[in-house]
From Swiss-Prot:
The species this protein was found in: Pan troglodytes
Catalytic activity: an N-acetyl-alpha-neuraminyl-(2->3)-beta-D-galactosyl derivative + CMP-N-acetyl-beta-neuraminate = an N-acetyl-alpha-neuraminyl-(2->8)-N-acetyl-alpha-neuraminyl-(2->3)-beta-D-galactosyl derivative + CMP + H(+); a ganglioside GM3 (d18:1(4E)) + CMP-N-acetyl-beta-neuraminate = a ganglioside GD3 (d18:1(4E)) + CMP + H(+); a ganglioside GD3 (d18:1(4E)) + CMP-N-acetyl-beta-neuraminate = a ganglioside GT3 (d18:1(4E)) + CMP + H(+); a ganglioside GD1a (d18:1(4E)) + CMP-N-acetyl-beta-neuraminate = a ganglioside GT1a (d18:1(4E)) + CMP + H(+)
Localization of this protein: Golgi apparatus membrane
Gene name in the database record: ST8SIA1
Protein name from the UniProt record: Alpha-N-acetylneuraminide alpha-2,8-sialyltransferase
Protein family membership: Belongs to the glycosyltransferase 29 family.
Keywords on record: Disulfide bond, Glycoprotein, Glycosyltransferase, Golgi apparatus, Lipid biosynthesis, Lipid metabolism, Membrane, Signal-anchor, Sphingolipid metabolism, Transferase, Transmembrane, Transmembrane helix
Superkingdom of source: Eukaryota
Functional pathway: Protein modification; protein glycosylation; Lipid metabolism; sphingolipid metabolism
Membrane topology (UniProt): Single-pass type II membrane protein
Keyword Iron: no
Cytoplasmic side, ranges: 1-29
Lumenal-facing ranges: 49-356
Length: 356
């Protein structure tokens, strides 16, 4: 929790104490008392504050500048926080080691549904997290429109391990800006439903689309929502049946839940974190160095010129589901302290300073 948050709570408690001293107690109707308790609890959990608007955030970034120096101490400290809260080295994906036969687990996105690991699911898991840890130099690539005409493709592809979000297009028209290399790509079940009709009639189209990701891991939240399990399993079987180069990993719901709690404790209150923040969180726990690209959820770039929402289209997300400005401010803070590097300018215009 931020110092400001603590101060607000202490102030509000002090104010209530003063009011209690000045005014005699009165008996309230039971319904009114219950309502007061609910309101006070809500304000305690979610203290009232005003998030800066888009223009204020952009102006703040411009004033602070994007100059950056790696801070190994800050990076190690945050990696330790990730290890302590969420253990990505062991819990990033479902494995035979962390999800043994017969284990009962809860969907992290639903409170009413659980599932039990049986032979049909256990056989789909790798023995352990299939990465040689720690990963050295990682690039996490979001899909923000700020990547368009960025010239960042070569810099992204220089990373040892590249993570991408939501099966993004990597055709030749984009590679100069976003690169072509991938080691891990996320795929939300909603994409499988909407773009590939749940793989009921378009298995070949799906397999052909996956070829662009070469030997990547396809990381899917099969056990976040009950409705996501079936399409995720279909992806596994489809790629397995044709001997595709890609390997499906299922996100561990305990890991996703822990990441959600971690960021909620730091002020991000959203129905669900974005895929990008989940990936950055994992990278900060798995990688020695982290650089992120395309994490800019605003309608203008650093020169206050209009940009599209994604580098490949301008389709806006559903309002209120993610807390993108809050997420950005948290990542921007990590950039400023040197724990990760956030690329916001054209790559050829950026000169990195040496490690401190």
């Amino acid at each position: 929790m931020s110092p400001c948050g603590r101060a607000r709570r202490q102030t509000s408690r002090g104010a209530m104490a003063v009011l209690a001293w000045k005014f005699p107690r009165t008996r309230l109707p039971m319904g009114a008392s219950a309502l007061c308790v609910v309101v006070l609890c809500w304000l305690y959990i979610f203290p009232v504050y005003r998030l800066p608007n888009e223009k204020e955030i952009v102006q703040g970034v411009l004033q602070q500048g994007t100059a950056w120096r790696r801070n190994q101490t800050a990076a190690r400290a945050f990696r330790k926080q990730m290890e302590d809260c969420c253990d990505p080295a062991h819990l990033f994906a479902m494995t035979k080691m962390n999800s043994p036969m017969g284990k009962s687990m809860w969907y992290d996105g639903e409170f009413l549904y659980s599932f039990t690991i049986d032979n049909s699911t256990y056989s789909l898991f790798p023995q352990a997290t299939p990465f040689q840890l720690p990963l050295k130099k990682c690039a996490v690539v979001g899909n923000g429109g700020i990547l368009k005409k960025s010239g960042c493709g070569r810099q992204i592809d220089e990373a040892n391990f590249v993570m991408r979000c939501n099966l993004p297009p990597l055709s030749s028209e984009y590679t100069k800006d976003v690169g072509s290399k991938s080691q891990l790509v996320t795929a939300n079940p909603s994409i499988i439903r909407q773009r590939f009709q749940n793989l009921l009639w378009s298995r070949k189209t799906f397999v052909d689309n996956m070829k662009i990701y070469n030997h990547s891991y396809i990381y899917m939240p099969a056990f976040s929502m009950k409705t996501g399990t079936e399409p995720s399993l279909r992806v596994y079987y489809t790629l397995s049946d044709v001997g595709a180069n890609q390997t499906v990993l299922f996100a561990n719901p305990n890991f996703l839940r822990s990441i959600g709690k971690f960021w909620k404790s730091r002020g991000i209150h959203a129905k669900r974190l974005s895929t990008g923040l989940f990936l950055v969180s994992a990278a900060l726990g798995l990688c020695e160095e982290v650089a992120i690209y395309g994490f800019w959820p605003f309608s203008v770039n650093m020169h206050e010129q209009p940009i599209s929402h994604h580098y490949y289209d301008n389709v806006l997300p559903f309002s209120g589901f993610h807390a993108m400005p809050e997420e950005f401010l948290q990542l921007w803070y990590l950039h400023k302290i040197g724990a990760l590097r956030m690329q916001l300018e054209r790559c050829e215009d950026t000169s990195l300073q040496p490690t401190s």
